[in-house]
């Protein structure tokens, strides 16, 4: 197989993956409450955990993959694009505080999340995230959980490194090229019509997939 990558811009990762357009969170389920839904089990209110386990496992596999690419000298040292960062989930108001507490009770029993910490007091919360209490009413109900080995990822830098790796192993990168049409042929292959800034007219490429 030969693989071709077609990029409309002059370099890869300049849109969604660009650092200015991407939050950079390493999504591992550590601090995303929407991955844990409230439910009732054995007559007791709790939260689901299946989705956070799946997401965390997927992210850990991604980290292993990046580390393997780095070991093979195909991408830069991971320190160039991934950094350890606290991941904090925040709940404000009685309902959210109760949800964060339920979430904590479920997560701390799971091996992937057993280092999770819960803070219900203002003093600890100010140490974890000082700005949360700036200008806030001291009577507010606030809950936080923290996992200290979360990550911040520069997905733009990572994507550029992976594109470099792609070309190192023989990948064909076409910059300033836009896909104009994609049609499946009778033989099951695909006819790709492209337009490049450097060539007049359109070009056609046949691909297996």
What are these regions (language model features)?
Residues 1-18:
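Glycine-rich FAD pyrophosphate-binding loop
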Residues 19-23, 134-135:
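Short, flexible, mixed-charge acidic loops at enzyme active sites
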Residues 2, 74, 207-209:
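Local beta-strand N-terminus motif with an aromatic residue
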Residues 6, 90-91, 148:
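Short hydrophobic segments within beta-strands
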Residues 144-209:
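Helical element adjacent to the flavin cofactor pocket in flavoenzyme catalytic cores
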